[in-house]
Structure formats: C-alpha cells, structure tokens
A protein has these predicted regions:
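Catalytic adenosine-cofactor/nucleotide-binding cores of aminoacyl-tRNA synthetases and other
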Residues: 400-404, 451, 567, 599-604, ...
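Acidic, turn-prone loop/beta-hairpin segments
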Residues: 102, 192, 196, 202-208, ...
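NTP-handling and nucleic-acid-processing catalytic cores
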Residues: 20, 24-37, 154, 166-349, ...
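Short cysteine-rich clusters marking metal-coordination/redox-active sites
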Residues: 195, 401, 480, 518-524, ...
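Conserved phosphate-binding loops in nucleotide/dinucleotide-binding enzymes
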Residues: 210, 323-326, 526-535, 555, ...
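Core structural elements
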Residues: 148, 171, 463, 655-668, ...
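N-terminal, positively charged nucleic-acid-binding surface of large information/translation enzymes
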Residues: 3-254, 260, 324-337, 341-356, ...
Length: 916
C-alpha cells in the first residue's frame, strides 16, 4: 500500500479546522444587509437598555452643515466619534449619542437664491424664502443621515437635533436672552469683517486666509506746521479716503531727513534700501512732540490727527500707520482714545456710497460713487500724484469670506456683540478670563490643543453675532422708536421664546408686534419696532449644549459633556462658540475634554480638490472596499496630524483587515468543538507563554485606546497577531490540534488559550470592526458567544493573569538560529519538511518543556538531550549551550507525518493510541 493512499485513509481521522465563517468579507455587498438588520433591531435602543445604571459617557456631536453630500472629512469625523463611543460602550459604560445638523446660514440661503433667482428672492415674502431654506436643509439632513449610517455609525438617528426645529430655535433665543441678562450683549458701531459679496458681517471663524495681490504703497502726508511730510505705508489704498489719523509709536525715535520726510529711526535704513527716501538724517524727533498735531491727507486735503499707539510695529513699513477707525480694529480702538471721526464711506456691497460726496472724501467724487473699493485702488494711486512715493505689488495672505471666497473688508456698522472684556457674574470676571481659566482645567487630545485654544482666546476681539441675512434665528428684540432703547423685560423675552417654540421663529416675520408682545407688558405696540438682524450660525451651534444637553428635549446624556470631538479648525469655531455661549449665559464649561483631528489629504500630503483629481469620495470607498476598511483607515491613522488617504493606503488597510479576519477565522475554526475552557494551571508552558504575551499586549492596547491612540494600539495588535500568534503559536499548535485526541489535555489547553485570545480580540476590535465582529459571532461556537445574540450583547473580556516559566529570549533565539539552518537545508534540497529533523540540545530552558512542547516549538519530530550517531546537518550555540540538527532516524507516520514511527508505513505510538 502506498503512503499517499494511507494519507487519504487517515485524513478523516484528523481534527481539521471547521467553520462556515467566510474567508472573504465581501464587505460592499454584505455590510448594507447587516446595517439594515441593526436598524430593524434598534441596536441603539438595545445598547441603552444593556447599560442601564452604568457609568455614563457623553460625546456631544458637533453639527455638520445640512448642505451637500458628505465628504471624506465628514466620514473621518463620524467614524472616530463612533469608535470612541463604542469603545466606552464595550468597556461597560452607558453611552448617549444624539447626532445633529446645522441648518441655518448663508450657504443654504445662497443655494435657494440660485434655484429661484435673485430677482424673485427680492419680492418673495421672508417666511416663504425661509420655508424654501428649511426644505433644502431637511432634504440634505436625510441624505447625510443615510450616508453616515452606511459608515456603520450607531446613533439616535430617529431623534437627531436640527437647529431649525421650533424648540431648538426657541432655546437658541433663550440662550441669547440669558447672555443679555448677564449684561454681555451690546450693540454698537464697530469695524467688523464684512463680506461684500454676501452682504453680511462675519465672525472670526467665518474668515479664511488666501493669497491675494495688493499694492504696497508709501504715501507722504504733509505736516501742517513742520516743513516735512510723514510717510505712511498701507496695502489698502481704498481705505485712504476714510483716514482720520496717523499712528506713531510713542516709545520709538523718529527722524527727519534732508529730503523732508519723517520716518521711524529703526526703519530708516530699510526705506533707503527700498528707495522710498534718499535724504540723510538731519534731526531726531520725539513722537510725543507730534501728538495731536495734524498732517494733510493728499487725497482730499482733510486733516489727519497724529496719535500714539502701541500697535505700531517696527518690523516693516515706515513707523507711521495710516489710521481709518471705520476700517480696522486697532484703528477703531486708538480712535476711541483720541476721539477720531469714524467715517464709513462703503456700503454693504463694497461700493463707495453718498458719504464720499457728503464728507468730500475725493476731489472728484463722481468717478468713485458706486465703484467697488478694490477696483478703486488704481484710480486712487493715480490721484495721489507726487504724494505716492513708492508702489510695489505684493502677494500676501489676506482674509477672505469662507463661503464666497472673495476678499473681505473691515467695515464699521451697527452690530450686536458679546463682550469679551466686560466683567460679569458671581466672580465679577470677564468672559475672556473665565474662558482662559476653564481651558487650564480641561483635558486635551492632543495636549497642544490647549495652547492653541488659549492663544485664540487671548487674541480674539468681541464676538460679532449679528448677520444681515434672512435664514437664521432672528435677534428678536423690540426697540423703542423714540428712545432707540431695546426692551429687555424678562416676561417679554420669555413670551417671544414661547411663541418661537410653538410656531418657529418665522413668527417674528409673520406676526404683528401686537401679537408678539407679552400682553401684560404695559408697552404700546405702536411705540415699538422689530430688530431685523439674525444670529451668526456659530451662535446656533454654540447653543447646542443648552438646546440638546440641558433642555430635556433629547435623551442626549450628561452635562457637561465628557467630550467634544472635531477637526482642528474648530479651535476657532465650535469649541470657542460653545465655550463662550455657555460661560456667558451660565458660567459653566460645556465640556470636560476636547479631542481634535487633522484634515484629510492625499498620499502626497496635498489638499484634495476636484481640479487636482485627488478627491477620495466616501461612497466610492464603500462601493470598492466597504466601510470596515474606511473605519480601519481612521483607526490606523495618527489623527493628531493630517490624515493621508489614497487607493494605495486603502489597499494597505485591506491587507491588514485580511490578516485580522483570517486570524480570527483560524481561531474560530480550531475551537469549534471546544466545550469548556480549561484552567490555566492545566495548560502547558507554550499556552501560558502566549497567554502571558496576549495579556501584556492587550493591556497595552487598552491603555492606548483609553488615551484615544488607536493607531498605537492597533500597531501593537498587528505585531502580536503576525509575530507571536500566527507566526509562532498557531503554527506550533497545529500538530496537537489536528492529530491529538479530541480530549487530550495538550489540545484542550491550546484550544482554551486560543478561545480566550479570540474572545479578547472580538471585544477589542468590536468598536472598530463592528460589522466583522458581529458577523464572526454569527458563526462562532457557543464557547465564544457567551449566550450573546449579537456583538452589542458582548461584554468586555479580561484575560487571566498568567506567569510564563519560559525564557522567551532563549526560545526565540534558538528558533531563529534553527530557521536559518532549515532554510539552508531546504534550499539545498536536503529536506522537504522540518519534520524530517530532530534537534539535540543540552539547554535546560528547552529541555524544561515536555517532549511535545519542545518538538512543536521547532516544528521538528523530536528534541532530545541524547547525542546522535548520524551526521550533524547544522549546529549553533545559545548562551553557551549546544544545539545540533540531525536527520530523524525513525520512520514517517502516515497520519501526523512526524518521523516517529518505529516501522515504515505504520502509525507512531501517539496516532495509534488516538485511533484506538
């Protein structure tokens, strides 16, 4: 009888791995089916029920904008939130996650205007326009909700918060009123970022910096009493008509030159080099001697008062700053000190208005009236004549409107502000002081977020919260027509909020003052008028802590939230607006920790754009790879910096996914007949070794996950799976798993170790690869399921503390040295399999293992301390101990293929015993 035939005969006697868990995930096809099941099973509600009475974790969702489809940055954000929520859930905590959407604001209003046309918009009733905006937002809420669910994100999708819901609008308004009650809401004329393309004021968070070419000019203002001209420098010639002052630095020296110019002494050499001036220094001037004197604006002959200000720097320019209080924050502040006129000759569309005629700001006003200010630059330079000493066009970073991407202007208008530097509340501190104190006590992931937020809070101006648009929550106050005073009566404000809650804030536009006014106010509706501005959308989103976490309108978790998590741009956006609104209204911080992630970029680290063709769309990734690969990409990325994504990177994550899936499949298949996990004390040295390794690694993974360093944890997991588990342990266990008796303690011990590791792998990866771990449980034997219906019933698995008696260094070194000899023998065709070999050693670390363990470690037929008489095929030493490799002298067992049979074509004693 041939051996081949015997092998075929004995194959049925082997305990080969058994599982129906597929090798391939077929994720794009199978995930949607699974997500549909989760929806039908209401797993979010199930998760709530499973953790009743447990410690809670609340991650408050920052609202994406309800306009357009989601992009890869949205996917990153929502997946990271989902992983963190599920991590805490599988750690045994009760989680709440109410998703939300930002529904008001300019982009939606612009989309509606594009659809109906600007002319129709002008004649459309405001409430009708607002309804069209509401419909547009609702459409994209539904679209984005579906897209987010496809990412495997579990949330309270049936009860999201929408900033346009009536109750929500009412609570935004209540937050505004609470801030007014604290005395921090002020209305004044002040320069603000102004988008002339969108005809509205902008907050700091709505300003983006882009490159722009501007004329850099030096202009001579002749002093009224000194025979010299002061040279100012500016890159905004269009603001020169509104100039009412020239700022000098009172702590610096100035000089007069032989060509009759006055400049800062520190900048004299630079001005000579740049050929702005040519003369030598003839006199040193104390700037305080020039204070409150006048120079003459060469553009219109109007006086320009010389003032002293700390904002005048000596790093560029001339040391004399052109000052137009209507066009700049510093200009405005210094203007208040010196009583400079605030002239604003520019209308909402960025064009010169009738002010230039009334104030005689140009010699020939007709050619400037109605002209866009940026188009006026060249005309102004021409009109300056000899007073223009130098012009150079420069490319520099300039503020642009975040929505229209047009350069903005500073424009003094009457706006509503939240004061940052007025004292208020119990502690009588400013909002800035309170915010900075809070930041010191928050937890930041990563830590550098603290300094970034602090720097922005330290340098920020008052918060301009008013907008001159239609789609938003109105700043709904009544103003006395005669006195111009705002009615801040609490009952009047509460009544307005009640109407908003019942009818929405469209009521402000649809109802008469007599209907909106609290009946018992004692005020005459005829004496009142409505304010017309709406709130900045950042105020909307900043109010979510009140409208969602504190209103009891949502089952949204605890206040303050445990975590806010958004992109790093939100240090100047939502993190700030949430902090400032909450502190201003109730002097409490809205969150305990802040986690920020970077932006998504392509493989080369470049920003994604349609023109470059490097955009990675989430729906394309889902169709090609599945959401599990996208989730693994998020978890494997260092989110603290920008995250690279490309087809190549996704393929790498697919490979990692396959490793995890196939390792899990192997574990599943080999514990299919295990009925009970044996105690650790009955396990062999190799089983204890791998459990000890697993315990250490999974503890490190858990610590990394608790610090939200998922990539660090997954790299440790990958290394363990590849090197220790698949690379060594699973390989060395195959003989006992397949060939030992079903009830042999060696086999049961290995199965038990594998079952414990499999359970830990499932609970560890459940937050990240939720679909795959749920699928795995479907096919898992009861020993792994623990009576769970699905992954959401799964509880945290804690591996036992195991002491390994193995000297890992010796075993691994010996295995590596033996591997080198084995490879050489295979290459020279001396052997086909390592089972043809036996090893002699006098190493007590190796001999301490029993015969089965030691031979399995090297995958040879035998390890002995008896010297052999045959030829040595190779040898090495570890710690002075000898290892010699020989050909096995026994015969090949036709069942296990080990060379341990006494006679040819007969079973070895182990296999013979098993088959009995």
């Amino acid at each position: 009888m041939k051996i081949e035939g015997v092998i075929m005969d004995y194959k049925e006697s082997l305990l080969l791995p058994k599982t129906d868990f597929p090798m391939r995930g077929n994720l794009p096809q199978n995930e949607p089916i699974k997500y549909k099941q989760w929806d039908e099973q209401k797993v979010y509600e199930k998760m709530k029920q499973n953790r009743v009475g447990c410690e809670s974790f609340t991650l408050h969702d920052g609202p994406p904008y309800a306009n357009g489809n989601i992009h890869i940055g949205h996917a990153l954000n929502k997946i990271l939130k989902d992983i963190i929520n599920k991590f805490h859930y599988f750690e045994g905590k009760s989680i709440r996650y109410v998703p939300g959407w930002d529904c008001h604001g300019l982009p939606i209003e612009q989309k509606v205007e594009e659809k109906i046309g600007s002319e129709k918009k002008k004649i459309l009733p405001k409430s009708k326009l607002r309804q069209l905006c509401r419909d547009h937002a609702a459409k994209f809420v539904d679209i984005q909700r579906t897209e987010f669910k496809q990412l495997g994100v579990i949330a309270d999708w049936e009860n999201p918060y929408l900033t346009m819901d009536f109750k929500f609008e009412a609570n935004i308004y209540r937050e505004l009123c609470a801030i007014a009650k604290q005395g921090l809401l002020i209305q004044r004329s002040k320069p603000v970022y102004w988008s002339w393309a969108a005809q509205t004021a902008l907050a700091e968070a709505e300003v983006e910096y882009e490159d722009k070419t501007s004329p850099s000019i030096y202009v001579a203002f002749k002093h009224e009493s000194i025979d010299a001209s002061i040279i100012i420098w500016t890159t905004t010639p269009w603001t020169l008509p509104a100039n009412t002052g020239i700022s000098l630095n009172g702590e610096e020296e100035y000089v007069k030159t032989s060509d009759k110019f006055i400049v800062a002494k520190k900048l004299y050499n630079a001005l000579i080099e740049n050929e702005v001036i040519k003369g030598e220094i003839v006199e040193t001037i104390n700037p305080k001697d020039l204070e409150n004197t006048n120079a003459i604006n060469p553009l219109n002959g109007r006086p320009s008062k010389i003032v002293l200000g700390e904002h005048v720097m000596m790093d560029s320019g001339s040391g004399a700053v052109h000052t137009a209080p209507g066009h700049g924050e510093d200009d405005y502040k210094i203007g208040l000190v010196y009583g400079l006129d605030v002239i604003m000759p520019v209308d909402a569309f960025g064009k010169y208005d009738e002010t230039i005629v009334r104030e005689k700001l140009f010699r020939d006003t007709e050619k400037y009236l109605g002209l866009n200010v940026f188009k006026a630059n060249d005309l102004i330079l021409e009109e300056l004549g000899d007073a223009l000493l130098k012009r150079v066009d420069i490319r520099h970073s300039y503020p642009h409107c975040w929505r229209t991407h047009t350069p903005i202007i500073f424009r003094a208008t009457k706006q509503w502000f939240i004061s940052i530097d007025d004292a208020y509340g119990k502690e009588n501190k400013t909002l800035r002081e309170n915010a900075l104190n809070v930041v010191e006590n928050l937890t930041f992931y990563p830590e550098w977020g603290r300094n970034r937020l602090k720097a922005m809070l330290e340098g920020r101006p008052d918060w301009c919260i008013s907008r001159q648009r239609d789609w938003g929550v109105p700043i709904a106050f009544f103003r006395n027509k005669k006195t111009d005073e705002i009615v801040f009566d609490e009952k009047v404000l509460n009544y307005t909020a009640m109407i908003f809650e019942q009818f929405g804030c469209d009521a402000w536009y649809d109802m008469e003052i007599s209907e909106l006014l609290y009946p018992g106010s004692g005020l005459n509706p005829d004496d009142l008028e409505k304010t017309t501005d709406i709130l900045d959308v950042w105020f909307d989103s900043g109010s979510t802590q009140n409208a969602v976490l504190r209103s009891r309108n949502y089952d949204a978790g605890t206040f303050p939230a445990d975590m806010y998590l958004e992109g790093s741009d939100q240090h100047r956006g939502w993190f700030q607006s949430s902090l400032l609104t909450t502190l201003a209204s109730s002097e409490i911080a809205p969150y305990k920790s802040i986690l920020t992630h970077g932006f998504t970029v392509d493989e080369k680290g470049e920003k994604m754009s349609k023109s470059k063709g490097n955009v990675v769309a989430p729906d394309k990734v889902l169709k090609e790879y599945g959401s599990e690969i996208l989730r693994l990409w998020v978890a494997m990325s260092d989110y603290q910096s920008d995250l690279k994504i490309s087809d190549n990177i996704l393929k790498q994550n697919s490979e990692l996914y396959r490793k995890i899936r196939n390792t899990a499949r192997f574990l599943l298949a080999n514990v299919s007949d295990l009925e009970e996990i044996v105690s650790v004390d009955k396990m062999g040295p190799l089983d204890k070794w791998v459990l000890s390794k697993a315990k250490k690694v999974f503890d490190e993974i858990e610590a990394a996950f608790y610090a939200y360093e998922f990539s660090k944890g997954l790299n440790k997991l990958n290394n363990f799976l590849v090197v220790d588990l698949s690379g060594i342990y699973l390989d060395v266990c195959k003989d006992r798993l397949y060939c030992d008796d079903k009830k042999d303690i060696h086999r049961l011990a290995s199965q038990s170790a594998m079952a414990l590791i499999a359970k830990k792998l499932i609970s560890t990866m459940a937050p990240i690869l939720t679909y795959t771990m749920d699928e795995l449980l479907e096919f898992a034997p009861e020993i792994l399921k623990d009576c769970c219906d699905d992954i959401f019933d799964y509880k945290k698995v804690v591996l036992p503390e195991v002491e390994s008696a193995i000297d890992e260094t010796v075993l691994l070194s010996a295995k590596e040295k033996f591997s080198e000899i084995k490879d050489s023998l295979s290459k020279e065709k001396v052997i086909k399999s390592t089972l043809e070999l036996i090893i002699y050693t006098n190493s007590q670390e190796i001999l301490a293992l029993d015969e089965v363990e030691s031979s399995d470690w090297f995958l040879v037929s035998s390890v002995t301390n008896n010297k052999q008489n045959s030829d040595i095929l190779g040898s090495f030493q570890i710690d002075g101990k000898d290892f010699e490799v020989y050909k096995a002298s026994a015969h090949k067992c036709p069942r296990c293929w080990k060379f341990t049979a006494v006679k040819e074509e007969t079973l070895c004693s182990r296999c013979e015993k098993v088959l009995e």
